[in-house]
């Protein structure tokens, strides 16, 4: 009886533990953020019915022979973060990071896209969520970097929505843009992690949960 229980534990552990995905440079890592005002506002405006709702995306790279993520973050702008640090910023599902790795179906031009992304290192984070202002937010970094060999952007920009599902404007956005002295760019072209994660050009290669 004790032997049967032991075998059952082994099989349950094997079945319930999600392995770390095998990552390639250029894979896009999408994560659901931990609870914060900004994460809540992004998810409310861009989330889909299915879980998790992604609020951040970064680019997997190998930097100084270590696994890392090239990302645009409110703290530090466009920077390189250790992969573990990136995953630690995720919400948890079953105690594991709520993060998914996705890969381009067509990788033509990917090396040039990565070089382009590295060229943005040091730019400030784009709290205004507007294009062509010398700043970048997370999915904007991917949008600007990932291009086809003939220079076209791989991912489309769509009219941005900052409103919650009930049509209300979250206080986070109202207060943020009041501090910036800018109008909320509702309806202006832009990107977000949730839309990008559902782009048919990408396929899932693994998840941590």
Please provide the spans of the model-predicted regions.
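Bacterial N-terminal signal peptides
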Residues: 5-14
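Cysteine-nucleophile amide-bond enzymes
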Residues: 16-209
């Amino acid at each position: 009886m004790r032997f049967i229980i032991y075998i059952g534990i082994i099989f349950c552990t094997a079945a319930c533990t999600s392995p770390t995905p095998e990552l390639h440079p250029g894979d896009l890592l999408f994560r659901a953020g931990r609870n914060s005002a900004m994460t809540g506002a992004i998810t409310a405006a861009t989330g889909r019915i299915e879980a998790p709702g992604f609020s951040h995306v970064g680019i997997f790279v190998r930097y100084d022979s270590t696994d890392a993520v090239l990302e645009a973050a409110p703290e530090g702008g466009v920077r390189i973060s250790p992969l573990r640090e990136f995953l630690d910023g995720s919400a948890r599902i079953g105690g594991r990071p709520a993060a998914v790795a996705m890969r381009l179906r067509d990788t033509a031009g990917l090396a040039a896209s990565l070089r382009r992304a590295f060229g943005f290192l040091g730019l400030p984070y784009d709290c205004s969520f507007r294009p062509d202002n010398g700043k970048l937010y997370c999915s904007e970094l991917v949008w600007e970097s990932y291009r086809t060999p003939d220079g076209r952007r791989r991912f489309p920009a769509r009219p941005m929505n900052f409103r919650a599902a009930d049509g209300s404007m979250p206080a986070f956005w109202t207060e943020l843009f009041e501090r910036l002295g800018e109008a909320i760019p509702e309806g202006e072209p832009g990107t977000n992690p949730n839309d990008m994660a559902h782009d048919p050009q990408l396929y899932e290669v693994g998840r941590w949960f």
